[in-house]
Amino acid sequence: MKRRVLFLTSPVGPLGSGEGGGVETNLMNLTPILARRGHQVAIVAPAGSVQPSPDVQVYQVEGRPPPYATTAQRDQPIVCQADGVLERMWELAMRVQDQYDAIIGINYDWLAYYLTPFFKTPVGHIISIASTIDAVDEIIRERFYEYPNHFAVNTCAQAATFPFIDPCRMMSLYGGVDLAKYEFNPTPQQRISWVARISPEKGLEDAFAVAQRLRLPLDVCGKMQHREYWNDCIARYPDVDVTYHGFLDQATLHRVVRNTTAMLMTPHWVEAFGNTCIEALAGGTPVIAYNEGGPSELVQDGVSGYLVPPRDIDALTEAVRRINQLDRRNARKRAEQFSLERFADRYERFIEHVIYGSPETPVDWELQASHPHC
């Protein structure tokens, strides 16, 4: 059935800016597919956002962004802003709700969950990050018990950070890539890559440490959010041959990463998913990641990459040394399980679940059953 769906993106920055990380990536990839399938799709986003495709409407909203939840303390209080873009985005959604069959927020914002019962149109929530702030977790818990059919996560590992959620019964949406846009590269250069926002919780210094030990060139790509953190990495590891490419479009990023022997994922927090992981795999680049969070469900240890203990630089270094033992074709095969079509299928099931509800959560057992929590 064709649906009219209104999405609300992250309020931290415009679509296309890189500030919203994986939330942006997912919406930019997903909404054109849903529109081509005949759904009427729109997005509420901060002003300055790009349009994912001509058939996806974007409501542009002015306002001040909220603080980053990714760097918050657990006891951070909830503060509403009179000129806040988050507040104005949900105000707009309430004004236009009669034009839509479902409203889907991709967020980790207290206000979004609080407002759920005040809408006439069903509101679904895709929790965008792992448990971070106590007050936000509490409102999620309250609304989850009231509206259990209205919640989804990115991965089982993310769901497991919330003690009131059963990872095996909560729908995990994962992510998706347009495989046609990713060319397999069997013969990369002897370089390593790292792709994420330049921010302390992403653990860039660990990639610097490995590059210095092995004297390998390091390609770094991502939004520069914390210049002081970047400067500190440079100062601590002055001998690293590092190239900072900035925040790149999909095609340029792909050319950089597929030309490296491995991509490192070294987050110092629980990564909810990791779109860059499946993007790297799609080009045949194995991923070496810490064995926690979303990447632990995406990387097949010893097949499409390696999983190592979190913050274990020795293990990370040894995994890079062994990377040429892997068949890069297996990385591409793993990425094929995360096609955009399957991603859109999961979203369509979730949207129907939000509208009608069901005794059973429509999980993707082929992906979720491999997680240790299930």
What does each of the following model-derived ranges do?
Residues 1-374:
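Catalytic cores of nucleotide-sugar-dependent glycosyltransferases that transfer UDP/GDP/TDP-activated
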